Amino acid sequence: MVVYTNSRKVRTTRKTNVKLILSQHDYKCGTCIRSGNCALQSIANELNISEMPYDSILEKDNWDKTFPLIRDAQKCIKCMRCVQVCDNIQGMHIWDVVNTGSRTTVNVRANKNIAETACTLCGQCVSNCPVGALTERDDVGIVLDAIENEDIITVVQIAPAVRTAWGEDFGMSKEYATAQRLVAGLRRIGFDYIFDTTFAADMTIMEEGSEFLERLPEIKESGLPMFTSCCPGWVKFVKSEFPEMAGRLSTAKSPQQMFGAITKSYYAEKLGVDPDKIFCVSIMPCLAKKDECTWDGGKDVDAVLTTREVERMFKAFFIKPEELDEDEFDNPLGEGTGAGVIFGATGGVMEAALRSAYYLVTGNNPDADAFQSVRGLEGWKEASFDLNGTTVNVAVASGLGNTRHLMNAIKKGEVHYDFVEIMSCPGGCINGGGQPYKEDAVMVEERRHVLYGLDKRDNLRFSHENPSVKQCYEEYFEKPLSHRAHEILHV
């Protein structure tokens, strides 16, 4: 039997199907952020569709535009990818097919307002939407307003995972799209100070690692672990799905929030300025970070931009990153270690914490790769390590579906851990909902290799050896878990 896959009949049928999809899609490509990187646009171009014989029937929806995740109903093509990833990978069941007949569409389950659901803002639905019907709330405008205000000092921090992906849409290789070229571009846009969230990741390790060692006797007695608190998607998840476990979270702020708190206390004092004059911006691979900066406890961070938003800023400023010379982070909040860099990959927080916990217990550094068994993209990993005669059982999970299985096993007493790291996005922050759009898992593996390569080549691979962290404690916080540290760096 001969099967023809590109006959006139097949081509006509494909074109008709795509035209029918387009008839329910707002194809104003010139104003769509997915233009040039849109599956539907690509197919329409490949099929040479130049006219539409059908009238457009576009869905109307009143979406809360203040929510960090935005849905444009007129762009939705009912492909069900958001439903599939939310149900089958993340297990959150936020999206569903609603209404009947010609009014059938995809929307929030039970026609709820998105803010009323258990949505963690992991953003995996956004990453998998092929047409731009789901996007992040654009906060570029308020950031540019702050930059142009001469009375405001703009400070920006760059998350570890961002350096693995920011150059992808510009066609830059991983080796060329360095954090230093990103710094150069941001300086051209007009930020006053450009720092590295890796510094705050090292601070987080000092606080969280010390907290773990302090809580370890109680952990052993209760049989319940301490959980990391770096991922706001995970924090929202545990509070809504397993509220009885919320008290097991580390009290240390996430690196983003810790950086903001340090900027508006220690750094403001060093500059001799009113903290209210500082506008702190985060560049994150994540939608949930936009929500985290609004949580109770003070306005540590004023605005969060995703990696994609920064790419659009570069294009709006006609910046060609491939032509930029490298520039260095500002100090003292711009110095990080390899331990802080690997925060962007699943298992990275755990490995970094164990490196410094070993030092805090023994007074000696372990081999920097002694805890690498927690690395990898598996959804749920576990390991046991000896800390000066005490066996520490740890687990690492990424993806909320895997996390739910882990949490249920802990509740049932099927597994017992002392320390657990959770990231809401499969693979960790490198696969965050604010990263450049990807078509396969290969890109995630490449991003992971970038982080571990940076760690391997770094002269400093232990958070406790970061000289800027030491300086910060000597000049302001005294020591991890001090009274001032608890007031400013913990919730």
Which residues does each PLM region occupy?
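Fe-S ferredoxin-like electron-transfer domains
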Residues: M1-L121, S127, L134-N149, I153
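Iron-sulfur-associated redox domains of electron-transfer enzymes in respiratory
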Residues: M1, V10, R14, E136-V491
